[in-house]
Amino acid sequence: MGGVKCGKSFIGQQVIFDSEHPENIEIGDYCAITMRCILLTHYVIPRGSYHDYEYGKIKIGNNVFLGANTVITKSVTIGDNVIVGAGSIVTKDIPSNEIWAGVPARFIKKYN
C-alpha cells in the first residue's frame, strides 16, 4: 500500500492498488475495501508504435463499503456513506448517501 493515503479503514485480501501512482489514491475513515477490489489510477492507450497514459485520482470518502471484486477507475470520487455492490465497475463519481451496483455501476437507491 506504499503511497496510498488511507484513514482508519479495513483493506481485504488481494486488493490491488495501482502500482504506477499509488499516491493518487485516497481512502477515508471507516471504509471496507473488501477482497479482490482493484483501484486503477491510469489507463494505457495504444497509439501505433507507442502508448499514452492517462492518469487521474481516486478519492473515497468516509464510511464507504466496496463489495468484493469491485473495480474503481481513474478520476473517480466516491462520497461519504456509500455502498457499492460486489463485482461493480465504477467509472464515474458517486455522490454521498447512495447505493450503486452493476457493470458499469449505476445508481440503485438513496442510503440513509
Where do the model's predicted regions map?
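A generic structural motif
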Residues: 22, 95-96
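Hydrophobic beta-strand core residues of beta-sandwich domains
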Residues: 4-6, 60, 78, 94
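Flexible, glycine/small-residue-enriched loop-and-beta-strand segment within the central core
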Residues: 12-77, 103-104, 109-112
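Acidic, glycine-centered active-site loop in nucleotide-sugar glycosyltransferases
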Residues: 96, 101-104
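Extended, small-residue-rich solenoid/repeat segments and analogous flexible loops
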Residues: 1-16
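Beta-rich strand-turn-strand
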Residues: 68-92, 98
